[in-house]
Amino acid sequence: MPYIKHIETKRISARTYYGRFCVLPLPAGQGITLGNALRRILLGDLVGFAATSANLAGASHEFDTLPGIRESVLEILLNIKQLVFKQISSRPKDTNRFAMRASLNLTGPATVTAKDLVLPSWMKVVDPSQYIATLASGASLEFEIQLSQGSGYRLRRTSLVPPGFTLPPPRDPLEPENDSKSETKSKSKGKSKNTSTSDVQLADTDVNAQIIDTDSNSTETEKEAPHIPSMRDDHMTLHIDAVFFPVTRVNYRVEEEVINGRRREELVIDIWTNGSLSPRKALDQAAVILIRMLASLQAPPPLLIEPEKKPTTKTIAKEIALTPIESLDLSVRSFNCLKRANITNVGKLIAYTRQELLQLKNFGTKSASEVVDVLNSRFKLALKGEEVTDQEQVVNQPSSQIATKKGARKKVNRASRPIDSKETRRSRNPVKSTASEVPEKMLRKSSKTKVKAPKSETLPKPSKSANLQQAEESLQVPKLRRKSELSSSQNPEET
């Protein structure tokens, strides 16, 4: 696996930094390939800052001179071109890329250097002592520099038209010409080629007369002509060739050596920078740019269209567990008790047992049964330690089997009991109760004893007539009542 070995780094001057690095080990033949690629990127693709234009007060063009200043405008622009700028902190987000400016306003006598420039807070000049101009006493120098960020070398924008000048709109070729022009063209076509000398002289006199007329009316034409900005405008922008190269020079050489019987190569790179970037950072940025460039040549990964995920049992169970208890339509008492105990969803509710719920304040058996029924009917769930009961099977099964399943005592159907309700007693004995009721009550107590049926069999539901017959056979109440009626009819005085 190749790695970078740092050999040395030193500062030669304020605007010159030097560094030497070695990349090893490399397979045979790869040293020159990698070295050439890194060299081209270091010299051409790294980003830097440079001055692209300047506005000098009182300068109309680059060959102009300013009073009281030793250097001409051209020499000042060349000195500004050599300024090296460096970013020292993060750049504000709202700063436009092409809105970076540096300004200067100084009055002589003085020597203008780079430290006199007013720069943004996140930039500085690499060499503050770099010379710009010399001012005599009473002379002033005021200019504004526009800075840009880029890579490589950018030529200045040249324009022969001064700023503010507008050209007339182009004429439509399909538009017909004026009648006067067409007449003159037709007359010139009709004339013969052989013209006399007198005609030529007349034509010359006409031209001279026209020139005299234009000279006499020159004041009127100057007023009517549109204003063209003068080349000696104080606010004219002078463009500069921008040099963004942070790396000024790169050399490399390939050295061979034998490691474990195999021939390997070492790439030695020498880098010189202008001070805005260290040689080590320049090499790191070049490696990143080379990797991105080669990565774009790779085949794109296949586009995988993932199928829509169907809801599984886990997702359904999670949705049920997160169901709030407000949607269970519980009674106000049950809901308030659960809410007070911080039981907010179904998942927390089924984590409780019935006994734990009954221990909650104001939570009784009715509330517990209500909660169990709602969980069973809506979600087929039960409390902790209980099983889910199938309601359809419970409805279809007879009561005896349900009692045996639950471990309760098996009860005989109420229809098989002797019926002795108040209505039957009133129909049988319309007369008021007598002393014969005492044995009747005793008989009733004896009749209320429950008859235990075998566990494997269930008693059939008897009809109404069979119930009456069984009641008459088991109880002798009607016979006793008849005897009392006969005795009362024979001896009415005793009654």
From Swiss-Prot:
One of its GO terms (cellular component) is chloroplast. InterPro entries: DNA-dir_RNA_pol_insert, DNA-dir_RNA_pol_RpoA/D/Rpb3, DNA-dir_RpoA, RBP11-like, RNAP_asu_C, RNApol_insert_sf. Its EC number is 2.7.7.6. SUPFAM superfamilies: C-terminal domain of RNA polymerase alpha subunit (SSF47789), Insert subdomain of RNA polymerase alpha subunit (SSF56553), RBP11-like subunits of RNA polymerase (SSF55257). It is an enzyme of class 2 (transferase). It is found in: Plastid, Chloroplast. Keywords: Chloroplast, DNA-directed RNA polymerase, Nucleotidyltransferase, Plastid, Transcription, Transferase. Residues 1-301 are annotated as: Alpha N-terminal domain (alpha-NTD). Residues 207-219, 391-403, 464-473, 486-495 have a biased composition (Polar residues). Residues 172-186, 417-426 have a biased composition (Basic and acidic residues). One of its GO terms (biological process) is DNA-templated transcription. It catalyses: RNA(n) + a ribonucleoside 5'-triphosphate = RNA(n+1) + diphosphate. Residues 317-495 are annotated as: Alpha C-terminal domain (alpha-CTD). In plastids the minimal PEP RNA polymerase catalytic core is composed of four subunits: alpha, beta, beta', and beta''. When a (nuclear-encoded) sigma factor is associated with the core the holoenzyme is formed, which can initiate transcription. DNA-dependent RNA polymerase catalyzes the transcription of DNA into RNA using the four ribonucleoside triphosphates as substrates. The N-terminal domain is essential for RNAP assembly and basal transcription, whereas the C-terminal domain is involved in interaction with transcriptional regulators and with upstream promoter elements. Belongs to the RNA polymerase alpha chain family. HAMAP family: RNApol_bact_RpoA. This is DNA-directed RNA polymerase subunit alpha. It comes from Nephroselmis olivacea. The gene is rpoA.
